[in-house]
Curated annotation (Swiss-Prot):
Its main location: secreted. GO terms for cellular component: cell outer membrane; extracellular region. This is Surface presentation of antigens protein SpaN. The keyword ATP-binding does not apply. Transmembrane segments: none annotated. It is found in: Secreted; Cell outer membrane. Belongs to the SpaN family. The gene is spaN.
Length: 292
C-alpha cells in the first residue's frame, strides 16, 4: 500500500525546535503524547488483516536539521517477527531523537496487538551509547475483524487470535525465501467508525514479487516465481483457511504442505501439521509464542 494512504501527525514545529536543543544522548527521551494519527484506508477482508506490524523509521542529520519519518503496515513472514496487531484510530507514541552535535538513527518497532514494542537507537561513532528499551501499548487486541464468506461482508467480533497466526505459516511456505514482506491496506478498527457490515471492494495491489487480488471475503495470491496464470485463492470457512489452487501446478505445491479435501481444496487450521515442513512450522510457532 502506498504511504500516502496514511496521514501521520508526528510532531509540531515547536516540539521539533525544542528537541533540537538537546545536547547529548542522555537527554533523549521517549514521550507519550496525546497526539492522534489519522488512518485513511480502503475496505478489505479478514485474510491477513490482523497480521501485521507497524515499523517507524526516523533519521536525523544535524547538518540538514530535518526529521525523516515513515510508517508502513507490513505482513511479515516467519523470519521477520511475524505478529498480529490491532490498529486503533489514534496512536500515542512520540519519539524525540534529535541530537544537534552528531548524526543519529532510530528505529521503533511496535507490535500493537501483542502489547510489546522496541525502541532502538544508534548514535554513530559511539557504540557504548547504543541502547534498547521496551514499551507497553494500551491497545486492546480483543476487537478483531471477522469475515463472512456467505455474503461478503465484514464486521466486528471478539474471537481467538490463534487462527490469525496461522496465515503466516501458509504464506512463508508457499513463498519460500523470495520476499520477506509485502504491504496491505489496513482497515480502521475503531469501533465507533465501523458499521455493522460493509461491502468489500475488489482491489489489486502490486508489491515486490506478488500480486494480491481481493474480492468479497476471498483473496487470490499470484506468486511471480510460479509464472503467469498460477495462483492460490485463500478464504476463511468454519474457523479454518481454505486454499483453492488455480491448476494442478499449484496443487502439486500445496500437496507438499497441506492435505486435500473431498472438493479438491486444501484446508489449514491450528490442529493440522504441515506435511514435509513440520520442523520449520514448529520453530515458527515457538518463536511466535515467545514474542506474543
Amino acid at each position: 500500500m502506498a504511504l500516502d494512504n496514511i496521514n501521520l501527525n508526528f510532531s509540531s514545529d515547536k516540539q521539533i525546535e525544542k528537541c533540537e536543543k538537546l545536547s547529548s544522548i542522555d537527554n533523549i527521551d521517549s514521550l507519550v503524547l496525546k497526539k492522534k494519527r489519522k488512518v485513511e484506508i480502503p475496505e478489505y477482508s479478514l485474510i491477513a488483516s490482523n497480521y501485521f506490524t507497524i515499523d517507524k523509521h526516523f533519521e536525523h542529520k544535524h547538518d540538514k536539521g530535518e526529521i525523516y519519518s515513515g510508517i508502513k503496515n507490513a505482513f511479515e513472514l516467519r523470519n521477520e517477527r511475524a505478529t498480529y496487531s490491532d490498529i486503533p484510530e489514534s496512536m500515542a507514541i512520540k519519539e524525540n531523537i534529535l541530537i544537534p552535535d552528531q548524526d543519529i538513527k532510530a528505529r521503533e518497532k511496535i507490535n500493537i496487538g501483542d502489547m510489546r514494542g522496541i525502541f532502538s537507537y544508534n548514535k554513530s561513532g559511539n557504540a557504548d551509547k547504543n541502547f534498547e528499551r521496551s514499551h507497553t501499548s494500551s491497545v486492546n487486541p480483543d476487537n478483531l475483524l471477522e469475515s463472512d464468506n456467505r455474503n461478503g461482508q465484514i464486521g466486528l467480533k471478539n474471537h481467538s487470535l490463534s487462527i490469525d497466526k496461522n496465515i503466516a505459516d501458509i504464506i512463508s511456505l508457499l513463498n519460500g525465501s523470495v520476499a520477506k514482506s509485502f504491504e496491505l491496506p489496513v482497515m480502521n478498527k475503531n469501533t465507533a467508525d465501523i458499521t455493522p457490515s460493509m461491502s468489500l471492494q475488489e482491489k489489486s495491489i502490486v508489491e515486490n514479487d506478488k500480486n494480491v487480488f481481493q474480492k468479497n471475503s476471498e483473496m487470490t495470491y499470484h506468486f511471480k516465481q510460479w509464472g503467469a496464470g498460477h495462483s492460490v485463492s485463500i478464504s476463511v470457512e468454519s474457523g479454518s483457511f481454505v486454499l483453492k489452487p488455480s491448476d494442478q501446478f499449484v496443487g502439486n505445491k500445496l500437496d507438499l504442505i497441506l492435505k486435500q479435501d473431498a472438493e479438491g481444496n486444501y484446508r489449514f487450521d491450528s490442529s493440522q501439521h504441515n506435511k514435509g515442513n513440520k520442523n520449520n512450522s514448529t520453530g515458527y510457532n515457538e518463536q511466535s509464542e515467545e514474542e506474543c
